[in-house]
């Protein structure tokens, strides 16, 4: 049984399948409140222009409708235009959407951000020259470096301050209760995903995960996400991968599709890196291939370990990209919609064969 955990004061934190129940289960399925809250804020602000959307289509509209019904207004509404404008013009800020994955609770997320901003900006709002290597506490040094990667300039730090204040307002006024209700309403969906993973697909993914250096990790079901998951690689604990939280029990398998799309990234990113020149990387050509390589790589992985999922996976990503297809020709449609340089595709195939060979 999945257990819902709450921090002191009734704040939602996570829904977790205990590893103790399955000592061999080195990957677990769970949820994490602050991951959803942080991604929620980005979903409400970020313009989705990618072929596979960053966020679940209709998510923003559904939240707007929910707030309208409850006559709820927050700082995210009043400051939304300025936050949205700056986000659209600064790619570093976009990368900050991964920040929630580094922390175990919303309280620790806020504390880290507050400490970072206190050290980065003085009381009179002038920037301080901060060298994270000079911090005595190694944990603080690591956390500050993580935050600084996306929020290093004064305008970016102002954006972070405003965005965090908006997230606090969202959390206090409605999102904590909204999230908790969603977890209750989706308990059967969570159980269905967990069952698919523990009873069937962990065993099928296990060899690839082990061979690709991902022998343990955590799968987070995330409300704002659909086809594009979010992956944080942590050497000590293994990857934390946020995937879509399906909308129904019948769609529970969608979480496996997105997981395949995400766990292939060490292989797909390596293939792109090895088959693009430094000049192409500088010009953004390599970035152009990253998403197609993940979609194609996830498909190839499932063809080898779980062929029963291939057609559903292909349809899921074609639908996400709003691309029509002929039933029975889904794989060909994926290859056409997500083109790859032949050398990248060949390396994907070769590396998968290597990772899945032997015992």
Where do the protein language model's features map onto the residues?
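Post-HEXXH active-site segment of zinc metalloproteases
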Residues: 269-294
């Amino acid at each position: 049984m999945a257990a819902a955990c709450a921090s002191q004061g009734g704040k939602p934190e996570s829904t977790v399948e205990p590893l103790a129940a399955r000592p061999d289960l080195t990957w677990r399925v769970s949820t994490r409140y602050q991951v959803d809250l942080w991604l929620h804020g980005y979903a409400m602000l970020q313009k989705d222009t990618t072929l596979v959307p960053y966020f679940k289509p209709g998510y923003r509209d559904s939240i707007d409708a929910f707030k309208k019904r409850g006559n709820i207004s927050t700082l995210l509404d009043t400051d939304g235009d300025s936050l949205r404008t700056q986000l659209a013009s600064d790619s570093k800020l976009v990368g900050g959407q991964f920040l929630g994955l580094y922390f175990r609770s919303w309280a620790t997320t806020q504390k880290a951000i507050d400490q970072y901003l206190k050290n980065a900006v003085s009381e009179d709002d002038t920037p301080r020259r901060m060298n994270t290597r000079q911090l005595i506490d190694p944990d603080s040094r690591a956390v500050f470096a993580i935050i600084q990667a996306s929020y290093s300039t004064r305008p970016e730090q102002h954006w972070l301050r405003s965005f965090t204040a908006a997230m606090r307002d969202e959390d206090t006024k409605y999102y904590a209760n909204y999230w908790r209700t969603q977890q209750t309403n989706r308990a059967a969906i969570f159980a269905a995903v967990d069952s698919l993973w523990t009873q069937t697909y962990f065993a099928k993914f296990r060899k690839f995960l082990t061979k690709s250096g991902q022998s343990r990790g955590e799968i987070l079901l995330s409300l704002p996400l659909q086809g594009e998951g979010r992956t944080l690689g942590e050497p000590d604990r293994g990857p934390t991968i946020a995937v879509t939280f399906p909308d129904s029990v019948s769609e529970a398998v969608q979480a496996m599709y997105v997981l395949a799309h995400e766990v292939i990234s060490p292989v797909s990113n390596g293939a792109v890196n090895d088959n693009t020149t430094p000049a192409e990387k500088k010009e953004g050509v390599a970035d152009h291939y990253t998403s197609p390589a993940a979609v194609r790589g996830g498909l190839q992985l499932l063809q080898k370990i779980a062929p029963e999922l291939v057609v559903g996976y292909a349809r899921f990503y074609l639908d996400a990209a709003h691309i029509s297809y002929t039933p029975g020709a889904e794989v060909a449609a994926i290859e056409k919609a997500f083109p790859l340089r032949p050398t990248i595709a060949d390396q994907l195939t070769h590396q998968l064969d290597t990772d899945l060979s032997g015992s």
